[in-house]
Amino acid sequence: MEEPESQPRERRPGARLLILGPGAEGVRLDLFLAAELDLSRSQARRLLERGAVSLDGRPLAPGDKGRPLEAQGELRVEAFVAPADQRIPQPGEAEAPPSVLAEGPGWLALAKPPGMPVHPLEEGEKGTLLGHVSALRPEVHGVGEGGLRSGVVHRLDVETSGVILVATEDAQWDRLRGAFREHRVAKRYRALVEGDVQWPGDRLELELPLRVARHKPAFVRVASSEEAARGRSRVIEQTMQKLETLPGASLVEIEPRTGFLHQIRASLAHLGHPVLGDLRYGGSRRGGAHRHMLHAAEVAFEEVRAAAEDPDDFGSVLARLRSAESDV
């Protein structure tokens, strides 16, 4: 988990600062870079070949690619700046733009449609949420991490729909990133899950040690007691409430207090209730779920507040289940 920085650091366009914690211990450098930066292993190794990676201020070489990391330290990745017309995320030509839910000085809240990436992974990629934001608010360019991640405060999986925050000023980016890092942002998700959830009082307070078991494609599982004891996991916390019992499924609400890769999807699968449509974690196509039925319904931090209605596909699956017209 990243810790708040004690003093402001120089921000360079495209530079990434990665704080190493317990979850990084023993992980190969190239695998860690690939997972954290959404790269392939070959792309991560090319960063090393170009001298773009340093650890605690010491440049790393290509021969360090298999080096196991420790549970502390700072990795800095210097991105290579492309021509300006390529660095700006481009909106898609055919996609409907995500709707603006709320906005204030230096920030926007948008409703991310399912299937739309938050930001591009390479120059020239179109159809991302940030591409639409850059067309709507050009001042986002260079904010925060800059480059292809300009203004991005947090992320949602590509298939997950719902509220996403983007900063259009550096001061707001610092403030909001700090709030997410310190778990001061209230988040509420809705999910359609397999089976009839049986929790005492239809409510469950959950703490689980999770770890990334595979990076490409990412897969998260509950850590063994030995892995947890060695610090190779991260304890996640969330509150879950069953809202409705459906034929072969349940509608649940999740309020995560921590933020970890696939936290909600992996924890629900561990409990025997994978998200409908989430084939990676054991979910089925029940109700015609063509993607994982997980929706970020609300985000709130001080005056920054926004809520998003269920998208059409989520509502359609819910309606089919309610009328017992499931495909399964």
Q: Where do the language-model regions lie?
A:
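RNA pseudouridine synthases
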Residues: 1-328
